[in-house]
A protein has these predicted regions:
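Short, contiguous hydrophobic alpha-helices characteristic of membrane insertion segments
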Residues: 43-44, 94
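Internal alpha-helical scaffold of NAD(P)-dependent oxidoreductase catalytic cores
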Residues: 1-31, 44-81, 126, 130
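Short pre-catalytic strand/loop immediately N-terminal to key active-site residues, enriched for Gly-Thr
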Residues: 28-34, 86-91
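NAD(P)-dependent Rossmann-like dehydrogenase/reductase catalytic/cofactor-binding core
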Residues: 69-137
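Aromatic-residue-lined binding/catalytic grooves and analogous aromatic/hydrophobic interfacial grooves
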Residues: 39
C-alpha cells in the first residue's frame, strides 16, 4: 500500500512523461506494460509498415514518411479530442465500398485484431516472466 505522499510523487513524475492510469490490482501492471510500455514500438512499427506500403505504391521515401507520420499523428489527435470510441471514429471515416473499406476488409481477412491481441498477450507474458526473474512478487 502506498501513502498519499508517495502516490502524489509518483503522479508528478509519471505525468511529466505522459498519461497516468492507476490500476487497482498489481497483477494488472503486466498488461499496462504490454499496452503502454511496449505500445510506442507498435505504433512505430505501423508507421514503418505504412511507409513501406506507400513506397511500394510509388511514393518517394520522404513523401511516404511524411504521410505516414501525419496520418498517425492526426488520427491520434482526433481520437484524443473525441468522446467517440475509436470504432465509431473508424466508421465515420469509412465510406461503404470505398478505399478505406477495401483496406479494412483486407486487415480483417488477415486477422489484424487477433494479431494485435497475440502480440499484447506475448508482451504481457514476458513482463510477468521478467517480474519473476528479477524478483517482483
Amino acid at each position: 500500500k502506498t501513502s498519499t505522499t508517495q502516490r502524489q510523487l509518483a503522479e508528478r513524475i509519471l505525468l511529466a512523461a505522459g498519461e497516468l492510469v492507476w490500476v487497482d490490482q498489481e497483477d494488472a501492471l503486466d498488461a499496462v506494460t504490454a499496452v503502454s510500455g511496449s505500445g510506442p514500438a507498435y505504433v512505430f512499427y505501423l508507421i514503418e509498415a505504412l511507409e513501406e506500403a506507400a513506397m511500394a505504391e510509388g511514393l518517394l521515401p520522404n513523401e511516404a514518411r511524411r504521410l505516414a507520420l501525419a496520418t498517425c499523428a492526426g488520427a491520434s489527435r482526433l481520437a484524443l479530442q473525441s468522446s467517440e470510441p475509436p470504432a465509431r471514429l473508424r466508421e465515420q471515416v469509412t465510406s461503404k465500398g470505398g478505399t478505406t473499406a477495401a483496406a479494412l476488409a483486407s486487415f480483417k481477412a488477415d486477422g489484424f485484431v487477433e494479431m494485435v491481441q497475440r502480440a499484447v498477450h506475448s508482451a504481457r507474458l514476458r513482463a510477468r516472466a521478467m517480474g519473476e526473474e528479477y524478483g517482483a512478487p
